[in-house]
């Protein structure tokens, strides 16, 4: 690996070597690489319940008012599985005394937007039927998972219209949204325009690249895959982007949009879109906080047994405690 001109935490450098190229233009190769890297069976400490919609870790001695933490996996919207995060989610269930739900959302391009967002909502609705509607909810996502977390919360709060606007659906969304206490967005992937400074500065990564992002966004929105040259800029209609990731508006506070914790990496093409989201929420009157740890890069925030992951868990723990 060539030496980076940017500071990277030494403890995280092995991640770059171990991570296969994110070939969103060649999904069979990308998915196979992810399977080889991440598909290591985890022996759960807590009780694990698996349904078609997701995987739930339930800690022993579960409190009646224990929260539900929805933990949405990343993968550029086109790869990954809920089981890949079993070790992390099992750990979070123990640490927070929470039911940790990882939705098994369907992947693009086979299932483009809004299907993955609706799958996450359906997984949460199913969990509430099983575990009760009296529990506070927190929503956590990493990278594309953070994008789905934000899009999911916006949909539940009525900031974008669901495909089916029947009264029963709207009433269910209103009930669920009233229970959400906070949303945690780690290195969020929410801006398909590829127009930020960091998108250009870190076009070659490490790990997540501008070309990978262009392919992922084409797949997510069900559009033709751009050529490498075309992928340098976005041709996704603005109205389509807004339907998935609406920019913060002044009325967000009025609808009770939940507090947000946003974490970005200094060396990441997605850095500036996360910063823009956090400041946009603040400018809209919402409660939001923004963190950036020196030397992190895309995909490095939850590396097991790292100081970085300890810092992130502490942030999440404090945020959940304050907003419970």
Where are these predicted regions, by residue range?
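Alpha/beta hydrolase fold serine-hydrolase catalytic domain that processes acyl esters and thioesters
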Residues: 8, 26, 35-37, 133-135, ...
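Short beta-strand element of the alpha/beta-hydrolase
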Residues: 65-74
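A fold-wide structural signal in alpha/beta-hydrolase
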Residues: 68, 97-101
């Amino acid at each position: 690996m060539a030496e980076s001109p940017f500071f990277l935490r030494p403890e995280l450098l092995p991640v770059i070597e171990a991570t296969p190229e994110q070939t969103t233009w060649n999904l069979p190769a990308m998915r196979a690489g992810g399977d080889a890297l991440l598909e290591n069976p985890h022996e759960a400490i807590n009780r694990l319940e698996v349904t078609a919609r997701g995987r739930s870790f339930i800690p022993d001695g579960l409190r009646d008012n224990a929260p539900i933490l929805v933990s949405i996996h990343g993968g550029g919207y086109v790869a990954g599985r809920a089981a890949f995060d079993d070790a992390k989610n099992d750990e979070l269930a123990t640490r927070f005394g929470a039911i940790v739900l990882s939705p098994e959302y369907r992947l693009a391009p086979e299932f483009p937007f809004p299907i993955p967002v609706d799958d996450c909502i359906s997984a949460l609705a199913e969990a509430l039927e099983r575990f009760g509607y009296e529990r506070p909810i927190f929503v956590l996502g990493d990278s594309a998972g953070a994008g789905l977390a934000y899009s999911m919360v916006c949909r539940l709060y009525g900031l974008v219209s669901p495909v089916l606007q029947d009264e029963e659906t709207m009433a269910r969304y209103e009930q669920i949204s009233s229970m959400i206490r906070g949303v945690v967005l780690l290195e969020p992937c929410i801006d398909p325009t590829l127009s930020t400074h960091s998108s250009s500065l870190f076009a070659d990564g490490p790990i997540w690249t501008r070309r990978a992002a262009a392919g992922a966004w084409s797949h997510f929105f069900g559009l033709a895959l751009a050529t490498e040259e075309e992928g340098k800029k976005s041709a996704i209609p603005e109205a389509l982007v807004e339907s998935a990731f609406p920019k913060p508006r002044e009325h967000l506070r009025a609808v009770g949009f939940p507090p947000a914790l946003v974490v970005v990496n200094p060396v990441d093409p997605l850095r500036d879109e996360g910063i823009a989201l956090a400041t946009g929420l603040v400018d809209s009157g919402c409660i939001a906080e923004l963190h950036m740890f020196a030397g992190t890069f895309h995909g490095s925030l939850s590396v097991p047994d790292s100081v970085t992951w300890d810092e992130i868990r502490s942030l999440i723990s404090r945020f959940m405690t304050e907003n419970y």
